[in-house]
């Protein structure tokens, strides 16, 4: 019973790494590349960027935790051959993480230069967090469901 709790803590730690390290690094990148217009200052724009980046990471983290909870305690495993059928569920949670990018894309104010770089950051954050968390810490019964997990995961 200890291993699932450790895996859930590890998933949360991946999310914390994204909150603590990735968003500030992207914020500095935006500070040096993005050029705003007369309607909004760079500090206001960066504040909006950080808000929507944090929102996307939170949604991706919740999706990864729900995948773990479903795989560990909800899905019944009677045949190992049928474990790969849950890939559609994993793809559904991945879709939730991807769709969390949309509010940031729509509600981040337009800027004069390099504004679309925020979109790239939103997508990389959400996909990176969800994929890494599920690749490394999926439940044992479904640990090979994420793509390329057979090449990475040996525990």
Please state what every model-predicted region is.
Residues 1-5, 44, 48-53, 82, ...:
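Hydrophobic, aromatic-rich alpha-helical transmembrane segments
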Residues 1-14, 76-92:
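Alpha-helical transmembrane segments and their helix-start/interface "positive-inside/aromatic belt" motifs
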Residues 1-62:
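N-terminal signal-anchor transmembrane alpha-helix
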Residues 7-8, 106-155:
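Alpha-helical membrane-associated segments of multi-pass integral membrane proteins
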Residues 14-19, 62-66, 96-100, 125-133:
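Alpha-helical transmembrane segments of multipass membrane proteins
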Residues 19-30, 66, 70-75, 108, ...:
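Membrane-water interface at transmembrane helix exits
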Residues 54-79:
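Canonical alpha-helical transmembrane segments
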Residues 80-115:
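Hydrophobic alpha-helical transmembrane segments of integral membrane proteins
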């Amino acid at each position: 019973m200890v291993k699932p709790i450790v895996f859930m803590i590890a998933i949360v730690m991946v999310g914390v790494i994204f909150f603590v390290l990735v968003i500030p690094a992207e914020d500095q990148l935006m500070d040096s590349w993005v050029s705003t217009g007369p309607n909004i200052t760079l500090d206001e724009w960066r504040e909006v960027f950080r808000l929507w980046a944090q929102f996307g990471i939170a949604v991706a983290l919740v999706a990864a935790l729900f995948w773990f909870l479903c795989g560990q305690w909800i899905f019944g495993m009677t045949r190992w051959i049928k474990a790969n059928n849950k890939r559609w569920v994993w793809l559904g949670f991945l879709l939730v993480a991807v769709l969390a990018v949309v509010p940031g894309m729509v509600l981040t104010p337009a800027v004069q230069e390099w504004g679309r770089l925020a979109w790239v950051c939103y997508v990389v954050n959400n996909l990176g967090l969800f994929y890494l968390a599920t690749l490394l810490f999926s439940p044992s019964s479904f640990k090979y469901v994420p793509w390329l997990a057979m090449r990475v995961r040996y525990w």
